[in-house]
Amino acid sequence: MNYTLFVGDLHLSADRPDILNAFHQFLDQDASHCDALYILGDLFEVWVGDDIAEPFALELAERLKRFSTHTPIYFIHGNRDFLLGKEYAKRSGMTLLPEIYSIDLYGEPSVLLHGDSLCTLDKAYQRFRRFRNMAWAKFIYNHLPKSKRIAIADKLRSKSKQSNQIKSYSIMDVEQSAVEQLMAETGAKRMIHGHTHRPDIHRLANDTQRIVVGDWYEQGSVLKISPKEVNLQSLPFGETEA
């Protein structure tokens, strides 16, 4: 049976070998089955540049490259790995997609994105997001010394954690009006995203739906879509049969 897999928010790092092993196992078990694998951002906990890839990321690139020889891999940047560039993508066999991407998924018009752009009530974050996406800002950052880039990334992560602790639940979730606007603009019947770490299948008006792929902190989360079914799965680490 044909099917496509979607994952996101793995937040891979050397500090969590259990997540790394679970994702490696997931790739190995499903390599010969799915039509395509879409990674919807935040594959890594942090990414400060293709030239500073850690050993675990280089090993993952080799695994992804092998996977891509028979199954296409598509990647949309998240808020943690928005600096992942063409060099690492090529090394991994991944195709970089724009931050909002429309596809025909077995006859169903769908729109894919990481999801942070939908959290429009978080004004401070949206201001930072606009700044960090500017070409000149990326250019300057990428030309800083490696030590400076790492220091900036560490400071931003720390500030983000502190800020999120005091933000309300609603501010950190997507805004319904932003969802409706994007669905209307793209003509999509289905929206698929991550970012919020709140996996669910939301039934919307006019027979549309919004699917949120979960994170991989305590267990895996995989969305499996075939011509006949939509299945959002939780995968306990060590059990990765999608």
Swiss-Prot record:
Using the UniProt record, name the top-level EC class of this enzyme in a single word: hydrolase
Query: What membrane topology is given?
Result: Peripheral membrane protein
Binding of substrate occurs at 79-80, 122, 160, 164, 167, 195
Q: Where in the cell is it found?
A: Cell inner membrane
Q: Which cofactor does it need?
A: Mn(2+)
Q: Name one GO molecular function term.
A: UDP-2,3-diacylglucosamine hydrolase activity
Give the reaction(s) catalysed.
UDP-2-N,3-O-bis[(3R)-3-hydroxytetradecanoyl]-alpha-D-glucosamine + H2O = 2-N,3-O-bis[(3R)-3-hydroxytetradecanoyl]-alpha-D-glucosaminyl 1-phosphate + UMP + 2 H(+)
Q: In which pathway does it act?
A: Glycolipid biosynthesis; lipid IV(A) biosynthesis; lipid IV(A) from (3R)-3-hydroxytetradecanoyl-[acyl-carrier-protein] and UDP-N-acetyl-alpha-D-glucosamine: step 4/6
NAD: is it a keyword of this entry?
Answer: no
Q: Answer whether the UniProt record assigns the keyword Lipid metabolism to this protein.
A: yes
Q: Which SUPFAM superfamilies match?
A: Metallo-dependent phosphatases
- Which positions does UniProt annotate for Mn(2+) 1 binding? 9, 11, 42, 197
Which keywords accompany this UniProt record? Cell inner membrane, Cell membrane, Hydrolase, Lipid A biosynthesis, Lipid biosynthesis, Lipid metabolism, Manganese, Membrane, Metal-binding
Enzyme Commission no: 3.6.1.54
For biological process, the GO terms are: lipid A biosynthetic process
Q: Which domain of life is it from?
A: Bacteria
The GO cellular component terms are: cytoplasm; extrinsic component of plasma membrane
Q: How is the cofactor bound?
A: Binds 2 Mn(2+) ions per subunit in a binuclear metal center.
Q: Which Pfam families does the UniProt record give?
A: Metallophos
Q: Which residues bind Mn(2+) 2?
A: 42, 79, 114, 195
Q: Which family does it belong to?
A: Belongs to the LpxH family.
Q: What does this protein do?
A: Hydrolyzes the pyrophosphate bond of UDP-2,3-diacylglucosamine to yield 2,3-diacylglucosamine 1-phosphate (lipid X) and UMP by catalyzing the attack of water at the alpha-P atom. Involved in the biosynthesis of lipid A, a phosphorylated glycolipid that anchors the lipopolysaccharide to the outer membrane of the cell.
Q: What is this protein called?
A: UDP-2,3-diacylglucosamine hydrolase
